[in-house]
């Protein structure tokens, strides 16, 4: 009888990687085998000799957990929004574009186990792989620590994006759209630099500059660095067609 990957002890190097990932997110995790499975793409497990676990089942679970958490949060936080507005917000938040963008924010791609083929094809930056992995990670948190901990993680990660959407009155992820545009046209990624912070700690405004290569493109302000980056990306995207690098 063949063993599954969860029956094998992964090395200390991999455990150190997973510990680093959790430390960056300030999350405690009990079952590292479960976490490792959540970050194991099917292309990786298919290349192993033994029958190995991958994150597809956890993705299935995490998709439902994520939808419930987002739905509950929207319903309770925005009592004056209509059903149509809430549905539109939820659809955007759990879309592949949004999930992959948030996965990039937490550097999830660096910790995913990929097969050689996906590795050589830049699989760590593929939206589908990143979106599936963050759903699997949410599913793993739910199994490991329960619904309350999964809710705390998801709301903490997604709430800023939700507030930005409602404040702007649209549901576009300008950072993701800009990154796709710049990578496709110039084969590089835009970068963001914190220029300055204005005001007291309890009411701080962050000022961010956006660059493509060495060229300054735009700036943005916000109550958080992420909000400032989003606004800088929005300005850049709307002006990008007129910019010659």
Swiss-Prot record:
Active site: residue positions: 63, 135
CDD domains xref list: DSRM_RNAse_III_family, RIBOc
Start and end residues of each DRBM domain: 173-242
Keyword Ubl conjugation in annotation: no
Subcellular location: Cytoplasm
Key words of the record: Cytoplasm, Endonuclease, Hydrolase, Magnesium, Metal-binding, mRNA processing, Nuclease, RNA-binding, rRNA processing, rRNA-binding, tRNA processing
Required co-factors: Mg(2+)
EC number: 3.1.26.3
Start and end residues of each RNase III domain: 18-146
GO cellular component: cytoplasm
Subunit structure: Homodimer.
Function as written in the Swiss-Prot or TrEMBL entry: Digests double-stranded RNA. Involved in the processing of primary rRNA transcript to yield the immediate precursors to the large and small rRNAs (23S and 16S). Processes some mRNAs, and tRNAs when they are encoded in the rRNA operon. Processes pre-crRNA and tracrRNA of type II CRISPR loci if present in the organism.
Name the UniProt record assigns to this protein: Ribonuclease 3
